[in-house]
From Swiss-Prot:
The modification Phosphoserine is found at residues 165, 168, 236, 238-239, 274, 292, 395. PROSITE patterns: PH_DOMAIN (PS50003). Residues 18-120 form the PH domain. Residues 235-244, 336-350 have a biased composition (Polar residues). This is Pleckstrin homology domain-containing family O member 2. Residues 198-213 have a biased composition (Pro residues).
Amino acid sequence: MEEESIKEGSEKPRGARTADKAGWIKKSSGGLLGLWKDRYLLLCQAQLLVYENEDEQKCVETVELGSYEKCQDLRTLLKRKHHRFILLRSPGNKVSDIKFQAPSGEEKESWIKALNEGINRGKNKAFDEVKVDKTCALEHVTRNRVRGGQRRRPPTRIHLKEVASAASDGLSRLDLDVPDSGPPVFAPLSDISEDQPQEPPRALMPPVKPSPGPETSAVEDSKETPAGERALTPDSASSGANPESQEDAETPAKEDSDVKSLPNSTLSEKLKVSWENPSPEKPSAPESAQLSSSETPEATPRESKKPPAPPPKILSEKMKACMSGVDASGSSQSSEAPETTSPEPTQVSVNGMDDGPESALQAMGIPGPAPEDAAASPALPFSDLPSQFHPRSSSLGDLLRESPQHPRLPKEKLYRAQLEVKVASKQTEKLLNQVLGSEPPPVCAESLLSQAVEQLRQATQVLQEMRDLGELNQETPGLVQKRKELVTLYRRSAP
């Protein structure tokens, strides 16, 4: 022991200066015999270096303290004061426990404390070390700059004044530049005020319709007379020749006021019919003879202002079937009309309409072309209408002579025949439905099958109820036989 104390009192080697703790300690060999040998231990951070002597030339063992759990006092069965301590390994590491023996109790406590600190450093080694990859390192901004020999002189007072004046000058310049950067306000207003008397932009505005003077309105009224209004005038022409001359002068002004006040969507049904089928309507002979030269040009400009002719209406089968009843009644009324109301044949030719379904439809106010050729052929544009009307200079004989140029009797007869066939077929269907509705429904296979299915369902329901009762009460052989007979009975009754 004295030798050990002498060794400890001797000077520490040069390697011990960098170590956390160094000294001579007895270390167990770990064998069965448990031999103890003096070793020079050197604690560096998280490593324990074991040497044979203080020269630190031959390292016998290197212990990584991170693989151990803790260092504590070793208690033996014998109560001798050996001052021993042990390094306990952490679970999961394939290292063995190491036993040491210190020369004194104080030395033992100091080594236990130092080794525990080394173990903690080994455990936290991953957190303490900061590894910086050189490839990912960012270059410093000013580290590689060339440094001058002297430091920069502080700015003088004159320099500060110059900087302040330049800054104030720049701010004033910015203030002056603000209006220029904003939207131009004064220059465009002056330009507009100078250009106002010329008024060139007004040409781009949509043209405002000026109120027409008395002369222009008279000219336009003399030029405009729609075909629909012309179709209305023959009704008043049948009253007499003298009142027509007085009413013809009054009707244009009234019609103009009515047309201007009412939009196109609120026109009467007769006007719509006249627009869709303008060709069969012609002016009356007495009216054409009595109209003055000033009233004749009223038709052309008014027609130009009217909306364009709608596309031809092709009646569907449902529409024709709905109108068939009206056409049949209209044809019977129109056949009786020429015998009673029109004794003269001139009225039929003047109106340009024969005993067709259109006369009945127009009298009842139902829009729709009656002749088949008018329904199938597209409506002629209003620009071609003046060519179809007879000239005003033609006489009554010319009108009567040219009237048979439009052969419509065969087509009208065919149309009537088709309508009669449709009406007859509909009436037959109605009668057949009434007869079938009054008779009892015949026995069919579906009703028999449904009855059989219902009987089978009732049988299965009764069988299920009997099964439930049989589970509660003990079934006798007689009940089982009855149930079988009942099932067979239901099966036989089912088709």
